[in-house]
């Protein structure tokens, strides 16, 4: 016979479980995902949207009637041969390609082979070389950028190959066809150029990564270039490592992760636009790049590794994009459900396999993603983040980009940097009422070359009182001349 005490205890447990089951998560709150123990039902007027395996979010509406693919496919376009130009063969240098900033770096110090001294509870000093020397001039900064790029490629991103020996391009209708040859191998891919402005060109354009989350409103006078980045490097989980046209050309065991392969693809698009400017009417010196979520990670890496990009526009890129590994780890250690380095390498193949050796102790890395953003400085960067999606690491992106901003400050270029973190919108749904004027100001200034609008922006609609920017960046900010 079961005692009354046992029955009472069982009823208490069942009652508690029932309360949890009946609890409803508020709008924009988390409602599921791997390891989630909180409410799985949403308040009336919202439904639980599975953003990914680890994070489900309550968003407005009643939900789709049928399952929607998260990463849509792109129909292949026919290749045409209206105009063809060929880049002359060049000797490919060994080692990673580094960003070529506008300042002549002169003779830069060699990058040491070791990781250096671990940095904990703060971010690496942008203005100190790996060997301990200080950055005191813009020429020094150019050398420091080269060093940062090499370190990122060595330990996280994988090697960016040099410009191939041959790039050919042709344009017909709205299709730009690109063929690349290197080492006896060749690949071809296409991009579509849409909304080309009428009238005398050349005109600016924004390269858009994929179609997933492609929600940025592009004003008149700016063309859009749709880039199927999955064609260059797949991102369908761990099994897609080494798959895509980049790896067809360089081998499936190449060290580059998908983000680096996509940046290489963007560089080839720029090459092709330089070759076909008379046919496309696109100005290759006035190019932006954008993407959201996973493709936002690709956008910021492309802006960092390709110096011909004038305006970088990552949207809700979170961890692996505008967020810093160290700050995400700090958030995770404080009980917040954010994506960190240990999880992200399990989800997909965005990074080099080399990165796996460091994800359990990111303090040993000689960089963080404030330095990835710094590879763009003083070129224009406008970062858009979503304060309602905790998985993105709202403190991580706020802190990381707030500290990244100091690099533009040192260069006297704060008008070229923007960070805007708002809420009340679904993941990758652009909140025009809150960020539309900011986005337009950046496009007007850096692509259309017209004045007007504020482009010195650092704001969040939420107060991050638990995080102190200065504590995480205790180093001095020089004035570089």
Curated annotation (Swiss-Prot):
GO biological process, one term: carbohydrate metabolic process
Active site per the UniProt annotation: 293, 427
Source organism (scientific name): Podospora anserina (strain S / ATCC MYA-4624 / DSM 980 / FGSC 10383)
The family this protein is said to belong to: Belongs to the carbohydrate esterase 15 (CE15) family.
Segments forming domain CBM1: 23-59
Binding site for substrate: 297, 339, 347, 391
Signal peptide: 1-21
Protein origin, superkingdom: Eukaryota
Gene name, Swiss-Prot/TrEMBL: ge1
Location of the protein in the cell: Secreted
Example of a GO MF term: cellulose binding
Motif range (GXSYXG catalytic site motif): 291-296
Main location (coarse class): secreted
Name listed for the protein in its UniProt record: 4-O-methyl-glucuronoyl methylesterase
């Amino acid at each position: 016979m079961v005692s009354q005490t046992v029955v009472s205890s069982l009823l208490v447990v069942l009652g508690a479980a029932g309360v949890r089951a009946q609890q409803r998560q508020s709008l924009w709150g988390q409602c599921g995902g791997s390891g989630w123990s909180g409410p799985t039902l949403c308040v009336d007027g919202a439904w639980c949207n599975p953003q990914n395996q680890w994070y489900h979010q309550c968003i407005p509406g009643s939900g789709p009637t049928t399952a929607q693919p998260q990463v849509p496919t792109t129909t292949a376009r026919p290749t045409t041969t209206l105009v063809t130009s060929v880049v002359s063969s060049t000797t490919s240098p060994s080692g990673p390609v580094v960003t070529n900033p506008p300042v002549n770096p002169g003779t830069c110090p060699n990058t040491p082979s070791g990781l250096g001294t671990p940095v904990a509870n703060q971010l690496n000093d942008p203005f100190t070389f790996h060997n301990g020397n200080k950055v005191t001039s813009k020429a020094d900064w150019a050398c420091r950028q080269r060093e940062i790029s090499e370190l990122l490629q060595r330990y996280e991103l994988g090697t960016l190959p040099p410009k191939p020996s041959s790039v050919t391009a042709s344009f017909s209708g709205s299709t730009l066809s690109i063929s690349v040859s290197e080492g006896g191998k060749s690949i071809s891919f296409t991009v579509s150029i849409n909304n080309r402005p009428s009238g005398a060109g050349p005109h600016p354009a924004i390269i858009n990564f994929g179609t997933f989350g492609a929600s940025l409103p592009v004003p008149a006078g700016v063309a859009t270039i749709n880039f199927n980045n999955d064609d260059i490097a797949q991102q369908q989980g761990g099994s897609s490592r080494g798959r895509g046209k980049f790896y067809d050309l360089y081998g499936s065991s190449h060290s580059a992760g998908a983000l680096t392969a996509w940046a290489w693809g963007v560089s080839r698009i720029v090459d092709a636009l330089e070759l076909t400017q008379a046919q496309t009417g696109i100005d290759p010196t006035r190019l932006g790049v954008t993407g959201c979520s996973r493709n936002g990670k690709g956008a910021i890496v492309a802006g960092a590794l390709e110096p011909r990009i004038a305006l970088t526009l990552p949207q809700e890129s979170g961890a692996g994009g505008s967020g810093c590994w160290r700050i995400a780890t700090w958030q995770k250690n404080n009980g917040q459900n954010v994506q960190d380095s240990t999880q992200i390498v399990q989800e997909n193949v965005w990074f080099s396999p080399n990165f796996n050796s460091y994800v359990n102790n990111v303090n040993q890395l000689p960089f963080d993603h404030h330095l990835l953003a710094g590879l763009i400085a003083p070129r224009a960067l406008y970062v858009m983040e979503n304060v309602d999606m905790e998985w993105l690491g709202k403190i991580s992106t706020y802190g990381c980009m707030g500290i990244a901003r100091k690099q533009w400050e040192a260069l006297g270029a704060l008008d070229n940097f923007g960070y805007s973190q708002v809420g009340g919108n679904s993941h990758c749904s652009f909140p025009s009422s809150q960020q539309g004027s900011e986005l337009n100001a950046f496009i007007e200034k850096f692509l259309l070359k017209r004045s007007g609008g504020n482009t010195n922006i650092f704001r969040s609609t939420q107060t991050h009182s638990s995080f102190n920017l200065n504590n995480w960046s205790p180093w001095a900010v020089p004035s570089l001349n």
